[in-house]
């Protein structure tokens, strides 16, 4: 008997989604999967007033949490930062009694405006992507979540339609069964 795929909450945070070809292409397969809930934070909270109980309920209902966003100033867009600070609160996700996310999985899916070669100690950004994403990895650890290797689409706006379609297929395949032995 085949087991059901893990329930995935895909938190999408892009303040200019209509202008992001790469992120729209990446989202397309996710919208067609029954085990994936796509939650567009900027569509739900244009005023930045986050419904914390609703967001925490969504987190409880899913086993895999995906944070898909562009890299903005070596971090995430402002609304996602606000979401992280407010929703992953002490007593819910961390600290005494904060075990609601323990054992769940965190995966960051990032698009960048620069090539991979720009993310080295001796290059433009002076740090590798693993260092840039360390705060997210630490947040996952704070929540006692499993950190899955990030998916990074470098120089997203310069990817060809074929390259983006290939990334989207691979992403969709992973989302369809994210906890399979080859998916982690």
Swiss-Prot record:
Q: Which gene encodes it?
A: kefG
Function in brief:
Regulatory subunit of a potassium efflux system that confers protection against electrophiles. Required for full activity of KefB.
> Which NCBIfam families does the annotation name?
PRK04930.1
Taxonomic lineage from the root: Bacteria, Pseudomonadati, Pseudomonadota, Gammaproteobacteria, Enterobacterales
Task: List the membrane topology term(s).
Answer: Peripheral membrane protein
Q: Which GO terms describe its cellular component?
A: plasma membrane; potassium:proton antiporter complex
Q: Quote the Pfam families the UniProt record gives.
A: Flavodoxin_2
Enzyme class label: oxidoreductase
Metal-binding among keywords? no
Name of protein: Glutathione-regulated potassium-efflux system ancillary protein KefG
Assembly and oligomerization: Interacts with KefB.
S-S bridge residues: none
Primary location group = membrane
Q: Which reaction does it catalyse?
A: a quinone + NADH + H(+) = a quinol + NAD(+); a quinone + NADPH + H(+) = a quinol + NADP(+)
EC annotation from Swiss-Prot or TrEMBL: 1.6.5.2
Keywords on this record? Cell inner membrane, Cell membrane, Membrane, NAD, Oxidoreductase
Annotated GO MF terms: electron transfer activity; FMN binding; NAD(P)H dehydrogenase (quinone) activity; NADH:ubiquinone reductase (non-electrogenic) activity; NADPH dehydrogenase (quinone) activity
Where it sits in the cell: the answer is:
Cell inner membrane
Q: Which HAMAP family match?
A: K_H_efflux_KefG
Transmembrane in keyword set: no
The UniProt entry's sequence similarity note says:
Belongs to the NAD(P)H dehydrogenase (quinone) family. KefG subfamily.
